[in-house]
Amino acid sequence: MASVAGVSHQTVSRVLNGFSKVRPETRDRVLAAIEELGYRRNTAARTLVTRRSGSIGVITADMNHYGPASIMLGLESASRAAGYSLSLAGLPEISATSLRQAVDQVLDQAVEAVVIIVAHEAALALAHSLHIEVPFVLVEGDLSATPLTAGVDQIAGARLATNHLLDLGHHSVLHLPGPLDWLEATARREGWRMALQEHGCRVPALMVEGDWTSRSGYGAGRAMLAESRPTAVFAANDQMALGLLRALHEAGLRVPEDVSVVGFDDVPESGYFTPPLTTVRQDFRELGRRIMALVLRRLAGELNASVPLVEPRLIVRSSTAAPSN
């Protein structure tokens, strides 16, 4: 391969192992030689020689939801750039048995570290109770419980959304929460509450709890309109905001003229809602980089390594405006 590419064996090794200090044109020649020769790395042999598998185990549930799926994509990109591959194990249910089986599954593949994408309070508690023989990192966990956590600042994101509506002149903001056994949902609820209190506003009772789906947002919207007529609503994610928009439309209410709506996530479709949705963007690519940085620091022996939370960003579109009255 080195002969075909016209480079040294050391250069081929650096390209194969993902080192960044290789000139782009040299890397391209090596990759072309790999393609021409049909080279496939013998991972088992490499593991025996180096005692490193170059693999990170990832345990997650709820991959059908935008957040966990996007975290996986961001982590996959960051791990590849660092020269690692991912070994995935799913959780069919949140239980000690299921989590232990998933951990054993990835450990059987000789992974060097384990990343647990924690969305539920119960899963977080179970993760802390396990004995894992390799370094591990939690995603969207509780920073107060362990520094070995990477995530997006959900409280800050909810404050951005709520402050935006209050700064437009709305006297109160209702909140459509996600499932409150999810850590993200409870953090977004807390950020909403904090923003209202900082503005001296009364904190309204929570609306019907949603489950992240458009259907639940629609149902919560109908229940809300049967009891009150808000001027501003912060939905815990964009999909629930979409269902809420449908409920408002069916009730003959205009967005944003009658009711302003803010979502959370900035899913790719949110700019094409009717109207385009004001929302809070989570940078999952940056989150993937920080997860991988935390993994590498743990592998280097830093027992209390930490990384800062990713800061979310408010994306203002056409679903919010000052109250008409």
Located regions from the model:
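Short beta-strand segments enriched in small/hydrophobic residues
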Residues: 11, 48-64, 164, 172-179
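Short acidic/polar active-site loop segments enriched in Thr and Asp
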Residues: 8, 54, 112, 170-172, ...
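Flexible loop/turn connectors
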Residues: 223-325
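Hinge/beta->alpha junction and helix N-cap segments in small-molecule ligand-binding domains
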Residues: 43, 61-70, 88-97, 150-160, ...
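N-terminal helix-turn-helix DNA-binding module of bacterial transcription factors
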Residues: 1-54, 324
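Alpha-helical recognition/docking segments in bacterial nutrient-uptake
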Residues: 55-163, 167
